[in-house]
Amino acid sequence: MSFKSIFLTGGVVSSLGKGLTAASLALLLERQDLKVAMLKLDPYLNVDPGTMNPYEHGEVYVTDDGVETDLDLGHYHRFSSVQLSKYSTATSGQIYTKVLTKERNGEFLGSTVQVIPHVTNEIINVIQSCADHHKPDILIVEIGGTIGDIESLPFLEAVRQFRCEHPQDCLSIHMTYVPYLRAAKEIKTKPTQHSVQNLRSIGISPDVILCRSEAPLSTEVKRKISLFCNVPEHAVFNAIDLERSIYEMPLLLAKENISDFLLNKLGFSPKPLDLSDWQDLVEALCDKERQHVRIGLVGKYLEHKDAYKSVFESLFHASVPANCSLELVPIAPESEDLLEQLSQCDGCLIPGGFGTRSWEGKISAARYCRERNIPCFGICLGMQALVVEYARNVLDKPLANSMEINPETPDPVVCMMEGQDSVVKGGTMRLGAYPCRIAPGSLASAAYKTDLVQERHRHRYEVNPSYIERLEEHGLKIAGVCPLGELCEIVEIPNHRWMLGVQFHPEFLSKLAKPHPLFIEFIRAAKAYSLEKANHEHR
């Protein structure tokens, strides 16, 4: 086999941070001059997370080729330089759909279709296809769910078979939780022992056990885990809870020397690891002594911390080159004191979303920021809110609206895109990377410093082309359009400190090592506004 595979499973509890671990391992392996590919296998029966409630699943991350995926792929992107595509994700829903389609087409020649071998063979095909497409030195495969879940069994069986076929080219990492009982003042290893027993009963013996814990594990505890879980003591690693930032994870794993162990196990020769640049970025990110800036997030799903994961992370990325310390203030659009909360912020971000709930609150936030010259950034639905507010209060169209909110509006300044009226919701939006031509002399041009960019999209609605001329006559600047059909991509409010809306999702391209330019300029504008307010108060 031309590539090596690392399979990452989780046990004891969910939300262990497998995605962050996989992303951090990718960073460490890339620093060894190895090409890494990544694959997330999700056991749920949905075909993809595109139609799932953000409160249940969190953010939907979109790849360049237009695939709606799990938010863990966002972690992969932000930590490493791996290329992500439709080959980087698979769900049980996709697997079963493929198997049943083949059965209907007669490809199994009348055989009884079963989980083994037909479903497991399809899972193995997914693993092989990812490697064939991306051609990595090492493929990291994260298996969603927790050992013991019935949904994960076909994936684990496929991994067992794959390991049997390629025993020298595969390695299994099992991530577990090691709890600390405060009353007894003891660290308990029994849950880890049982989780490994479950995994071994399926036929997979882990090569590495990565223990998540509140505090560092002693040598004695590691020795006990080694003894009862049948792994060498030097193959038991510790991932303690991170106190400052998720971006400390690669530094923590590097300190544990886990990448050296993995490389030796897979037949590579480790090189000295230099993470000084990453360390500097983390220190800058966590520096609380910098200028304090408050950003209000006026969003629909703020109760779920993962619903806007990429937006949150992009703001923090931008705080490093902007040299400030961010405080993110969640503001419910339905709040009675919405405007009072906004008045205490240095900038406002209105993220994407769907549906009528909270729409008018976003309109109010946009108006407040426009009239009071507060930096404001609208993304996707947020941009549409900026345009509708402008039409209502500057064009004097009080009934202007989006057709998503009110299909009967007399002034549909935001309308459904042509061909988007399908009753099938999954995977039918305008998805993936499209070009955007930037207008010279605009805020966007100052940020991008180029006249053509590629950005990722996920939407059905657009600024109504029949209203664009009137909007421009009243001062709204169309700062970016898609050359493929002249779709409005970026709008800017004139004579304003910094107010910009984008139809795309710039948060999907931001990294700690390469923050997105629009987020940088937004945070810089908010910082300047914060300093201006502080100077005014001290006069």
UniProtKB/Swiss-Prot annotation:
UniProt binding sites for ATP: 15-20, 72, 242
GO molecular function, one term: glutaminase activity
Record Pfam families: CTP_synth_N (PF06418), GATase (PF00117)
Chain sites annotated for binding UTP: 14, 188-193, 224
Region span, Amidoligase domain: 1-268
UniProt domain Glutamine amidotransferase type-1: residue ranges: 294-532
EC number: 6.3.4.2
Its job: Catalyzes the ATP-dependent amination of UTP to CTP with either L-glutamine or ammonia as the source of nitrogen. May be involved in lipopolysaccharide biosynthesis, potentially channelling CTP directly to CMP-KDO synthetase. Regulates intracellular CTP levels through interactions with the four ribonucleotide triphosphates.
Protein name in the entry: CTP synthase
Source organism: Chlamydia trachomatis serovar D (strain ATCC VR-885 / DSM 19411 / UW-3/Cx)
Lineage: Bacteria, Pseudomonadati, Chlamydiota, Chlamydiia, Chlamydiales
